[in-house]
């Protein structure tokens, strides 16, 4: 490692990002703890030495350097400072197992044109400071970015500015001279305020655009599609095929021509199919992400220019067509509104209304301002301009930095899986290699004793290595996950990362979103609770019967619906709310004649029916002047409306009851607000509060657009409560109960009200009736008092969404029973615990079941905190507000109609959580099958190893076609078909083991090999004892001394053993269906067994090709079949005894070791001491 190895994580200057760790360039999916970057540059003497070594060793080092590129870099280049590096070595360490991944990249340079880095005067701040400095970095840092490295070459060409950068997994990292480090290219929305984004609406000059393109690169998501010759070289130089080539050469030298030819043909066909599939997949992915179109951009001075989408850079201002179309980049909407279909990215099938980004000094963030951001790859269904002639959007991200680029990157560079099974499998292969070495030493000794020529000894000894280390093991293991992936696809569950299927079998906890996941998507309006003065009126079941007034107008206008092809579209709750009023949405891009100015939309009342309306005169249409769309973080939305005859416009706010009440004038909030809210939420209803506020007169739509959200959403007057019924899906309760029976924790993570979430949790069985539920309530530090934390029993009337009655709180007692306690808390409480009570957080997480009012980023944080406790975490949601959590989870399942989603490795087309147990059952089946296949491949290799060693002892071996029959006809057939067994129909409590190097697995391998060895040696010695036995001529080496009796007996017995072992390790329960359900596998076993029985009794036509000696003694043939039967019974008895008796014996001999997982340790601690502390006073 170079002395100049620089960490890429740490403090960074404003506007710049560090190297985002993780294979998908996503901090949320990061699984690394540190990254190091080392620089290397050219050295003439090292280059000469490099070529000498390669030439003297006949090019073999080139192959090694392809597998180990760091070796080649260190031999050819010398370590140097990063400022002068030509090649970089990136080392990424996994935080869980401390393993390192190495990557090498080339530093590239590019001359930057003479165009100015300053923007046009229109986009300058009032103080003259340039706002086009991408990322709004501190003054001077932008010029460092473009520098603006003056190299010796630059001097010779007139001091041209040269940019140094490198590309890693699609992302571009640039050299910052003043920081002496590489940083990910800064994005426009990083560190920039919303006002800065709005100032960019004038666009970039052509010169500035060219400079930025040199820095950001073209706006393309480039998928390399290699030619067939390139793919052939890559595939042929794979270590697997390198071992195959070595083996084929060895077999040819040993005169195994037929076997070598067949393996060569099979390997060639495999390579060709792999090349075709790889290229086809690359082409399909390239065609899927390829997006090239002509777009219109603004230029300074009011000009417009049509350019190719690949020319776009952050800072360009797009003019969006009214008919919509695909978005070629990520952009912030600064003028107009767009109706967008984001199903390809988030899985949200409902069109989303995007509104113009509000101005302000707050920083712009694509995630925070999702409702104002258009993402690359999404489809704009329609665009409407209200202020000005055009719908405008400022480009914020291009290429791989976009949302679509993130999806492609996650496919191209999936996050590495830290799974014990895969590590143990590598260790086991290494152990087999050691065994091969021991066998080689033994064979050398035996062959030397038998006076075999030296060249024959070398060939035979190396041949033993090809027997012990099974080259087909990776392919056999891959087949398991492919079968599982295919079965999931048939059930409507699509997986873009097949290796994650096995992780599904190890899930210990699953988080669920509520709305649309546990409950129905649609909501039914139960009624409205109006407010008169400071008192609630009785529930009005039909909102259309409300008198004309602020509450009715709020219900009719406070939404983000839009018309698409004459049909209202938008959030289902908004649709139901408006439908209950009977009002009709009309969108008028022209001026509203009734109001006298241009408006966003008009809500028209139904035909006047005096007998149904509590009103004296018919209602009038209401015009919407401005919308502040719903924000998950703010938990509310608002509109500004006006109508003919109104003296001043009004603002209507709709959102979380607790939050809206907090924004209202306390004099307008009834004293029984909390009790009224609880009466509905405790029954499982969803409650939304509505409030209003008169505003100063705004003469036009343009003036309304200047209003800030803080101005509109403050000092409100509470109007009433909208009560909606959100029913559980019929599949929810059975699934939750099934998970709990199998000891898989079910956790609810929702943005809904805490009381509603608790009611749903009890209704679906997350919290059983006899189990205690405790509310966790925290308060921020204030007035010199530290933050406090209280635990309040849910049965107590004191716990109503954090509002407590101190007179009754202390009188309630609960018998301590930690095993049946569940905690419920809100997002604000979760944030306080994370910040002020970090030591208590693990205990809260271990017992937490309901997490309500959680913002999207808090959902992600919760999943990550659970993973820190070493839970294998699943997450199931609809993909709308769960994107981060779905990506961060070990197994994320998005409920969507799309086949692939950016948010998760699994996408289910079924709209219920039934997919969760399906994924778990398939994961357990796949993992258990992987164990079986691995055991079988190891046993197959060891069985053949024993056969060869026995025959080597007498200076013979298996024949050419005998090897072919064993490896291709018998072993390959059963290894492929044994993986077809489907998953068990019911989830059990036991999880499949994750460790391959465990006592049960190793005991099974050892005892089965003892049995195999005993049967083969028994058959061999029985043959020697027969009166008709004629020893082979040991002076002649194999295969020239074939056929002989010893070979015939060993081959016949071992052939049966491959079938017996395949059947013995293919047990069904508890993770797979019974063996008899795998019909193709049983048919193959029956056919192959019949052929082998016929081969023993009546060799017939196969005797000659297989080089078998004819045994005429029928009694001896039956004796051989008796040995086979004994082997069959013994193998199954061994597996049965090991499955049923070994665990009990191990428990008696050695007490079960306590799990080292962090959450298990916490569970034991909580079981030994009463926790949490119940009302004895708050913790501070």
Curated annotation (Swiss-Prot):
Residues 1-44, 66-235, 277-427, 485-930, 979-994, 1070-1080, 1139-1180 are cytoplasmic. Changing residue 746 to T: In KRS; decreased ATPase activity; no effect on stability; no effect on location. Changing residue 504 to R: In KRS; decreased protein stability; increased degradation by proteasome; novel location to endoplasmic reticulum; loss of lysosomal membrane location; impaired autophagosome-lysosome fusion; impaired degradation of protein aggregates. Changing residue 522 to V: In KRS; uncertain significance. Keywords: ATP-binding, Cytoplasmic vesicle, Disease variant, Endosome, Glycoprotein, Hereditary spastic paraplegia, Lipid-binding, Lysosome, Magnesium, Membrane, Metal-binding, Neurodegeneration, Neuronal ceroid lipofuscinosis, Nucleotide-binding, Parkinsonism, Phosphoprotein, Translocase, Transmembrane, Transmembrane helix, Transport. It catalyses: spermidine(out) + ATP + H2O = spermidine(in) + ADP + phosphate + H(+); spermine(out) + ATP + H2O = spermine(in) + ADP + phosphate + H(+). GO terms for cellular component: autophagosome; autophagosome membrane; late endosome; late endosome membrane; lysosomal lumen; lysosomal membrane; lysosome; membrane. The active site is at 513 (4-aspartylphosphate intermediate). Accumulates in an inactive autophosphorylated state. The presence of spermine results in a dose-dependent reduction in autophosphorylation. The modification Phosphoserine is found at residue 151. It is a multi-pass membrane protein. Residues 45-65 dip into the membrane without crossing it. Glycans are attached at residues 1033, 1110. Mg(2+) binds at residues 878, 882. One of its GO terms (biological process) is autophagosome organization. Changing residue 517 to I: In SPG78; no effect on protein stability; loss of autophosphorylation; loss of lysosomal location; loss of ATPase activity. Changing residue 533 to R: In KRS; uncertain significance; decreased ATPase activity; no effect on autophosphorylation; no effect on stability; no effect on location. Autophosphorylated. Accumulates in an inactive autophosphorylated state and autophosphorylation is stimulated by phosphatidic acid and phosphatidylinositol 3,5-bisphosphate but not by Mn(2+) or Zn(2+). The presence of spermine results in a dose-dependent reduction in autophosphorylation. Its main location: membrane. Expressed in brain; protein levels are markedly increased in brain from subjects with Parkinson disease and subjects with dementia with Lewy bodies. Detected in pyramidal neurons located throughout the cingulate cortex (at protein level). In the substantia nigra, it is found in neuromelanin-positive dopaminergic neurons (at protein level). Interacts with MYCBP2; the interaction inhibits the ubiquitination of TSC2 by MYCBP2. Interacts with HDAC6; the interaction results in recruitment of HDAC6 to lysosomes to promote CTTN deacetylation. The N-terminal region is required for targeting to late endosomes/lysosomes. It does not traverse the membrane but contains a membrane-embedded intramembrane domain and interacts with the lipids phosphatidic acid (PA) and phosphatidylinositol 3,5-bisphosphate (PI(3,5)P2). PA and PI(3,5)P2 are required for the protective effect against mitochondrial stress. It is linked to Kufor-Rakeb syndrome: A rare form of autosomal recessive juvenile or early-onset, levodopa-responsive parkinsonism. In addition to typical parkinsonian signs, clinical manifestations of Kufor-Rakeb syndrome include behavioral problems, facial tremor, pyramidal tract dysfunction, supranuclear gaze palsy, and dementia. Spastic paraplegia 78, autosomal recessive: A form of spastic paraplegia, a neurodegenerative disorder characterized by a slow, gradual, progressive weakness and spasticity of the lower limbs. Rate of progression and the severity of symptoms are quite variable. Initial symptoms may include difficulty with balance, weakness and stiffness in the legs, muscle spasms, and dragging the toes when walking. In some forms of the disorder, bladder symptoms (such as incontinence) may appear, or the weakness and stiffness may spread to other parts of the body. This is Polyamine-transporting ATPase 13A2. The gene is ATP13A2.
